[in-house]
Amino acid sequence: MARRNRVAVALVLLSVTVLLCGCSKERMCRVPVGDATCQIEPDSPLYPGLNSTSGYEYLYGGYQGIVVIRTGWRDFVAYERTCPHDKGVLRMAPDYGNMVLECPDCGSRFSTFAEGTTVEGSVTSCSLYQYATYFDGRILYISNYETF
């Protein structure tokens, strides 16, 4: 009889766990991310948009491309161009000097100065996927991984 009770308790606990995990009201932010391991020389003529602060360039890589933004003389950020809401391809949008990425499909807008957080639109809790970057003074390394 004790074995039957333990099995019943285990089944009840398993059912409760499945229900609690499956009924979350929060939207999971899973953006597909492709291989983004690359190296560029941001001060070269190949990337004129990165020759000044607040400049940007689109790169191949990742899932639907990468946007690299120069935020300071030696500082860069790199974001996946896939919208967390509907997987549309993001593009830089003019916003009075603010660096904002916009999804043409759902209208969501993301601040590149605030770690890719949502400014407005359909997505309220999902930020852009940010790639790891490292600049050694000449070469900018971009990767899905934290180590270089």
Language-model features and meaning:
Residues S24-G97, S111-E115, Y129-F148:
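N-terminal pre-ligand scaffold of iron-sulfur
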Residues V18-G22:
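C-terminal motif of bacterial Sec signal peptides marking the signal peptidase cleavage site
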Residues S15:
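Conserved nucleotide-sugar donor-binding subdomain of glycosyltransferases
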Residues G97-G107, T117-A132:
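Short cysteine/histidine-rich metal-coordination sites, predominantly Zn2+-binding motifs
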